[in-house]
Each structure stands twice: as structure tokens, then as C-alpha cells.
């Protein structure tokens, strides 16, 4: 039995051979246990902690973005534009239950893992177009998101 987050037909060996660092893999409902682990108020509270690394991105227009870094206070979340995103890094340090997600990826060498990040945004909120220079597992807990992938080759 596959105890990882992979579909039954994809073993860790198949994932590493055919997908890891080669092509994206969408797994719908891959981690149902994380639903409701963090709600919006908990994310906002974490972002206000001095020890947390967080970013707030405000989109004022199609090509006008503004980046703010933590720590934040409650006033920072008032009068937000329609489109914004908040990101919190190293979530495994603040949520032991979410930190246990690494167990679902035990087949990935530990030296290739960085952190667990949470992103929250209203409808239409985004961090904008960007490239990640490292491997990323994106876990969308709820809501709808439009993901676009570009072949970097």
C-alpha cells in the first residue's frame, strides 16, 4: 500500500524516474487531511508574529505590484486592494501537524527539501508571473486557482 501522497498507480520509483525534475504532476485530492488545518485568521495571526517570515503582495493594477515583508500588524491587513496574497514560509516550525507533511514525501531526499509555505489570497489574488529556481510542491487546500506552467527548456 502506498502511504505517500501519490496515486496508487504511481510508486515513488515511478515518480522519481518520470516526474521529479522532469514534468509537472497534478494530484487532485492528494492530501485531504490538510483541509481545515489553517484558517484565514490563523494565517493572518502567524503573519503578525515577529518570528515568522511572511510576505504580503498587493496588486494595484495589472503591472503594479507592491511587496511587504514581515512582521506585520493588524493595520497592514486593512484596506487591502481587491487582489493580494500573503505567503508564510517555514510553516513546519509553527504547525507540527502540517510539518508532518514531510512524511508524505519521504521518498524525496531531505537535502532537496526546503520548507513548507502557505499562500492565501482572495479570488483573483496572485503573486504574479515568476520562475522558481528550485523544485516546488504546490498544495492547494481549498478554493480555485489558475495555474500556468511554462516549459523552461
Language-model features: where?
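Active-site region of the double-stranded beta-helix
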Residues: 1-18, 31-153
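Non-catalytic, conserved peripheral segments adjacent to functional cores
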Residues: 21-23
Amino acid at each position: 500500500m502506498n502511504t505517500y501522497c501519490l496515486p496508487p498507480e504511481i510508486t515513488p520509483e515511478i515518480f522519481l524516474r518520470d516526474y521529479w525534475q522532469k514534468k509537472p504532476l497534478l494530484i487532485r485530492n492528494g492530501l485531504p487531511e490538510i483541509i481545515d488545518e489553517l484558517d484565514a485568521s490563523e494565517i493572518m495571526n502567524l503573519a503578525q508574529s515577529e518570528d515568522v517570515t511572511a510576505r504580503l503582495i498587493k496588486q494595484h493594477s495589472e503591472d503594479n505590484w507592491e511587496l511587504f515583508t514581515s512582521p506585520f500588524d493588524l493595520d497592514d491587513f486593512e484596506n487591502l486592494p481587491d487582489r493580494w496574497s500573503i505567503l508564510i514560509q517555514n510553516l513546519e516550525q509553527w504547525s507540527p501537524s502540517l510539518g508532518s507533511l514531510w512524511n508524505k514525501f519521504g521518498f524525496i531526499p531531505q537535502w532537496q527539501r526546503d520548507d513548507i509555505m502557505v499562500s492565501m489570497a482572495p479570488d483573483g489574488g496572485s503573486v504574479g508571473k515568476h520562475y522558481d529556481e528550485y523544485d516546488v510542491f504546490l498544495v492547494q487546500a481549498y478554493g480555485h486557482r489558475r495555474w500556468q506552467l511554462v516549459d523552461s527548456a
